[in-house]
Amino acid sequence: YLYGTLAIPRFLDITGSRYQMSLFITRQLIVIADDSDFSIRLLQNIRMRKVHQGVNKGRFLFNFVTEFLERDYEILDSMEHTLMSMEEEASQRETENYQEKLMPLRRELLTLRSYYNEMVDFAKNLEENENGYFRKKQISYFDTIEDRADRLMNKTAQLLEYAEQVKDA
């Protein structure tokens, strides 16, 4: 069997507690165990929104992972706008409290970068298909997940660089 654990940040408290989830994958099935109703909510969303909910294990995992990565670009865009506002404040010498706002944002970005790195590794492990649980066609789903997580990680790294520039402003 394949086994993996995921620790997914909660977007209302990125540096706080995470949704903890374990996945057990065998040739026949996928078992998901978590410490909350998070996976149940994901599955309900998939049932409501996806036409191809899980015709095979690869497609199911793709839908499942992309469901919890769904809003990440939105969150990163929001963080970027916050940084742009801070930069504007700094350029107008309204620096009161902006350093206090910047540090938690940088911590959140560092947390997200680490999380996206873990997601890239998770997708690569599935892509390797060591046990032969997935057909060749299904492996492309994991490549897509890896690409998405990699883009999110790169966007996060860019925002960290931007935060550093704002800090120095």
Write out the residue ranges for each language-model feature:
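Membrane-associated alpha-helical segments
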Residues: 87, 94-169
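A short, ordered amphipathic alpha-helix with a cationic face
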Residues: 51, 74-76, 113
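Short intrinsically disordered, low-complexity coil segments enriched in acidic
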Residues: 1-14, 74, 139, 164-169
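Alpha-helical transmembrane segments of integral membrane proteins, especially early/N-terminal helices
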Residues: 27-32, 70-71, 108-117
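Divalent-cation
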Residues: 1-51
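A short, charged helix-loop
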Residues: 38-59, 84, 89-93
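Well-ordered alpha/beta subsegment
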Residues: 55-83, 102
